[in-house]
Amino acid sequence: RMRLRDLRAKGQLKSLVITSPTPQDGKSTVSMNLATVLAESGRRQVLLVEADLHRPSLAKTLGIEAQPGLGECLEAGLDPMAAIRKIEPLNWYLLQAGQAQGNATELLQTASLPALMESLTSTFDWVIVDTPPVAPLTDALCVAKLVDAVLLVLRAGKTPQDVVHEALGLLGPGKVAGLIFNGADGLNKLYAKYAGYY
């Protein structure tokens, strides 16, 4: 969190992608936890965008009803402000993935996504985007181009080192603001060489 605050203080950070090299690394849980931490003060409006259109899970995790969201915004021109809901008592806002009928990857490559992201970042103090894993899909890369920074979530003892290296290479060192080691006590020695990457 301190790293994010430093970047924010320098005016370099307002929007984030949270992704992982492989599935089941805990990126969605990290996304929700980060949104909660950033919203704790109550003075900033935090939006979590569920951009995993392939396997949306946040509604079920939060125990709320699934409703139209990002997919419908991109596919049918739905006003995002009509789909965003406040998550109480966590004090942050959510734009669900929705249930669009089109190809998920193609939707994230549409020309309307940059304008949508610009609108959201001008409305909210923080915009956190939970995307699918970096490989084998290109979804995370499509969204990463439109945000200020990326946080990469690794599952200690599970995420293969070669896949981590590949994900970092695809995202680029200038885009990755940090690595989050999920399920680890301290920095796992297997991944220590990546600590200075960003």
Predicted stretch roles:
Residues 1-198:
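P-loop NTP-binding module
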